[in-house]
A protein has these predicted regions:
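Charged, terminal alpha-helix-loop-beta segments
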Residues: 1-225
Length: 225
């Protein structure tokens, strides 16, 4: 508070950086998986900008609970929900990004390690969330696109994005998985990749692209699919 009063902004920023460093150390030391994912999300935001394959523009986006845009899916023919006629929820997506090559809006679900692939909030559950809210609901897709265009506009005004950055709203939103390897050696990474593919097959979501992230590298690259 005293730094703010003296308008010593350089010292204020330096002190804030120290506080943020302590915050990220605290996150690293937490055992809860979701906190590790939030830490990874932060690193992804820093690493994925207009100079890379994807520009991340938003995190933890929740689909509106308004009637026109809520998740509403009838998955009776989908093996991942046998016997269920109607399933409704308000899904939240980890990452919203724009692919810089074609300006397509992308929903990206981040997974850290093999334990994150199954059960509640597993890859099948995330596929359901996308299919029931965006892929099958034009109103939901339009709502999200318009909201992200507003985010882009605000970031341009704040000089966080270049003036010529845009979303191609004619292209349908794409769903992608991002998987962060726990292993560092090639044999371990191959085993994780094979396990991911098996879980994709079990969850009937083989049609979605997976971008793999090496340990300590948070750049989303289409060459790592």
């Amino acid at each position: 508070e005293s730094l703010k009063k003296t308008r010593d902004y350089k010292t204020f920023i330096d002190e804030m950086k120290k506080l943020m460093d302590k915050y990220w150390i605290w996150l690293y030391n937490e055992k809860h998986r979701s906190l590790h994912e939030k830490d990874t999300q932060h690193a992804l935001c820093i690493s994925n900008t207009e100079s890379t394959d994807y520009t991340i523009i938003d995190l933890e986006f929740q689909v509106s609970t308004r009637k026109d845009c809520i998740y509403h899916y009838e998955p009776s023919s989908i093996p991942r929900h046998p016997g269920v006629d109607v399933y409704e929820k308000s899904p939240r997506f980890d990452i919203i990004a724009v692919r810089n090559s074609d300006r397509r809006l992308c929903v990206i679900e981040l997974k850290n390690g093999l334990d994150a692939l199954v059960g509640k909030s597993g890859i099948g559950d995330h596929a359901d969330s996308f299919e029931g809210s965006i892929a099958k609901n034009p109103l939901a897709e339009l709502m999200i696109t318009k909201e992200m265009e507003k985010v882009v506009s605000d970031k341009k005004r704040l000089k966080l994005l270049s003036d010529d950055f845009y979303i191609d709203e004619k292209l349908p939103i794409e769903f992608i998985y991002a998987y962060a390897f726990k292993s560092e050696d090639e044999n371990g990474k191959k085993a994780e990749r094979d396990s991911f593919l098996r879980e994709q097959e079990k969850a009937c979501c083989m049609n979605y692209k997976v971008i793999y992230l090496n340990k300590g590298d948070f750049t989303l690259s289409d060459s790592n699919c």
